[in-house]
UniProtKB/Swiss-Prot annotation:
It is found in: Golgi apparatus membrane. Residues 1-7 are cytoplasmic. It comes from the Eukaryota. The gene is gly-2. This is Alpha-1,6-mannosylglycoprotein 6-beta-N-acetylglucosaminyltransferase. Its EC number is 2.4.1.155. One of its GO terms (biological process) is protein N-linked glycosylation. The chain crosses the membrane at residues 8-28. InterPro entries: GT18_cat, MGAT5_Glycosyltransferase. Catalyzes the addition of N-acetylglucosamine (GlcNAc) in beta 1-6 linkage to the alpha-linked mannose of biantennary N-linked oligosaccharides. Keywords: Glycoprotein, Glycosyltransferase, Golgi apparatus, Membrane, Metal-binding, Signal-anchor, Transferase, Transmembrane, Transmembrane helix. It comes from Caenorhabditis elegans.
């Protein structure tokens, strides 16, 4: 009997302990699943925010008379171009939505002044008012991104996790180097819509990334998400049309006030790609019209002025096209060229976003002695017609490859792969280990401007960069035939070409003597590990933080507040008839700055510079030139080169830049 009582007691204790525990785990599991499902269903995926309670705002409009509040400095129209019009509107418009009352507007002049100077930034503030807008803080915790992990491909999750230690180190570094750039930044609402993933069923790009497919886009999106999270902005991420619709509806249903209780109500920036832009245009036209200036388009190869509007391209498509295509499927968006954010800093008209070079796990102490090369080409088609250069390479070094679609048991395998150690598809960690033991990273001429050469350089390998006998462009190369740019590729990677020795040797790989000499030279160089600052976590954090804070494309900005600062502008005229503004600026060790074009597009300036008695106007990517000013803001162009027969001299605005950080001028900090 006692034994039975003991058993019952033990059973009771056991159940009393286990049942709540089981219920706890069941609840957590379900809550986690419910959060994930509701997050996707109702909001899209957002960063997990640790928000503080709203600040209690105390305002006293009796400190100033109504006449004092309506009195503005004499230079108000210069320093605050929209202030007086906004004051005129709000006197009648403040009753149109309750959010104005929530921001302490009561119909008095002082409440109008308070709102337009402290809540918004349209007017000069009254002296006693303190700033109250939410600020972004460096947040190097991966926890903020965990809800977003539900929606992104495996490769992106793996990369963000793998590099998170580097992101934290980068955050510390940038705060040490550039503290003034990283504090007092507005906390922005940022929508990230990865358009090509919304078309994943057709493209299978995420699926292919795990089996040797192209990684450039996924890599850049991964680094952008990490950057935006670390620099402290609020993210809304969508990878499909359903979550995009819910996010759009949420913001469209909010009132007109930018802030309520110190919390930002409106979207500030929308990152997407060309496929995503087309989805917005097709399904959310009104939203796009309202937020067009907030779009930032990830555009790897960049876009030139000739392709940004459909009208100009159609009128000139014969001269802008080669034998392969006369179409412009990736252009015609009508955006400011600075809204196109690129993979490399190759186009002064566009904005450089970039990516981060993976240096996780690099063995800097590894002094490998046996000369070896890894061929840059992870699919068989990239090796086509490369037998001669590969044979030269085999004669001198051990050759490795990572061709994912190569079956060594196939009886029809090309002879080019004989005596090549193929490792097949490797993940990031395995690639890193292989690069630690490689002397030469050997380019075959394609892919153009991928991330791999920078990673090889980070491991201390010399990149042999394939030089082209004739520069490649949309006019003569099928791969580029529909890209919205007239850029000319002189080699596989022009950015690496500029870096040069000891890290890069650019050579015609089909010239046997020159190639053999280059290979032997590469073996002897033994360069140190090197990553340009703009491709480090600290460099990307610094660049993106400044661009989001300073690059203004929506509102009228006073000259004194423009960025880059106007006092950094240097004006030159082109020397040769076919020079672009990039050509003349680069020859002075400067960059062409597109934001300065409206300033120099002035009849008095042209008359003074070119000794003109009068000026005309023209919608041309070469204007302003000679005695002609630019008629279309869409056609201002740093990159456009006029035909020699035009016999014109362009007027060009240039600026300096921080070494290894092209996007930022020396006084832009």
């Amino acid at each position: 009997m006692r034994r039975r009582h003991r058993c019952v007691a033990l059973l009771f204790i056991f159940s009393a302990f286990i049942t709540p525990l089981g219920f706890f785990y069941y609840t957590i599991s379900n809550e986690s699943k419910r959060y994930s499902e509701e997050s996707e269903k109702n909001y899209g995926y957002q960063t997990l925010e640790f928000t503080e309670s709203p600040e209690e705002i105390s305002v006293d409009f009796d400190k100033y008379s109504q006449s004092e509040c309506s009195r503005f400095p004499s230079n108000v129209e210069i320093e605050y171009p929209e202030c007086l019009n906004k004051m005129k509107w709000i006197k009648n418009g403040w009753k149109t939505h309750h959010c104005y009352i929530e921001n302490h507007i009561d119909g008095s002049e002082c409440s109008f002044r308070y709102y337009l100077s402290q809540v918004e930034n349209y007017c000069p503030p009254m002296e006693h008012h303190g700033k109250r807008k939410g600020l972004a803080k460096i947040s190097p915790s991966i926890r903020r991104l965990l809800p977003i992990f539900e929606s992104i491909p495996h490769y992106m999750k793996t990369r963000i996790n793998r590099l998170w230690k580097k992101w934290k180190e980068g955050a510390h570094e940038v705060m040490q180097k550039y503290p003034k750039s990283m504090i007092e930044r507005r906390k922005l609402n940022v929508l990230v819509f990865i358009g090509f993933l919304a078309n994943e069923q057709k493209l299978n790009m995420a699926k292919k990334s795990d089996h040797g497919g192209p990684l450039g886009e996924l890599l850049q999106w991964s680094d952008l998400l990490a950057t935006l999270s670390v620099i402290g902005h609020h993210l809304e991420v969508s990878t499909n049309k359903n979550t995009l619709r819910n996010i759009v509806w949420k913001y469209m249903s909010r009132g007109p006030c930018q802030y309520v209780n110190n919390f930002r109500q409106q979207l500030d920036i929308i990152f997407t790609d060309i496929m995503g832009f087309n989805i917005l245009r097709q399904h959310h036209r009104q939203f796009l019209l309202s937020n067009r200036c907030r779009i930032r388009l990830l555009d790897s190869f960049g876009t030139h002025a000739e392709f940004t509007t459909k009208t100009y391209f159609v009128q000139n498509k014969k001269s802008l096209s080669g034998p392969f295509s006369q179409r412009n499927p990736w252009g015609g968006h009508g955006l400011d060229l600075r809204q196109h954010w690129t993979f490399y800093p190759h186009s002064d008209d566009n904005t450089f976003l970039g990516f981060v070079v993976d240096t996780e796990g690099i063995d800097k102490k590894n002094n490998q002695m046996i000369p070896s090369a890894l061929v840059y080409g992870k699919e068989q088609y990239m090796w086509r017609d490369a037998e001669k250069p590969i044979d030269v390479l085999k004669r001198i070094v051990t050759v490795h490859s990572t061709v994912a679609d190569l079956d060594l048991k196939d009886s029809n395998i090309s002879s080019i792969f004989k005596k090549v150690q193929n490792h097949g598809f490797l993940n990031s960690e395995e690639i890193s280990q292989l690069l630690d033991n490689i002397t030469i990273f050997f380019g075959l001429g394609f892919p153009l401007e991928g991330p791999a050469p920078l990673e090889a350089m980070a491991h201390g390998a010399v990149f042999i960069n394939a030089k082209f006998k004739e520069p490649k462009s949309r006019l003569n190369y099928k791969f580029l035939a529909e890209k919205p740019t007239l850029r000319k590729w002189t080699s596989q990677n022009p950015y690496m070409e500029k870096i040069g020795e000891p890290h890069v040797i650019t050579v015609d790989i089909f010239n046997e003597l020159e190639l053999e000499e280059a290979i032997k030279r590469a073996i002897s160089l033994k360069p140190k590990h090197f990553v340009p600052f703009e491709f480090t976590p600290a460099g990307m954090l610094h660049r993106v933080a400044l661009l989001l804070e300073k690059q203004e494309l929506c509102d009228k900005i006073a000259y004194s507040k423009r960025w880059p600062p106007i006092d950094q502008m240097k004006i030159f005229r082109t020397l040769n008839a076919d020079d672009s503004c990039e050509t003349i600026c680069h020859s002075k060790q400067l960059l062409c700055e597109p934001s300065y074009f409206p300033i120099i597009n002035s009849s008095p300036l042209l008359r003074r510079e070119n000794l003109c008695s009068s000026t005309t106007s023209d919608s041309s990517p070469f204007a302003p030139f000679n005695c002609t000013i630019q008629q279309s803001a869409f056609l201002f162009s740093c990159a456009s080169s006029p035909p020699i027969s035009f016999e014109i001299n362009r007027l060009c605005p240039c600026r300096d830049y921080i070494p290894e950080q092209h996007a930022i001028c020396k006084k832009c900090l």
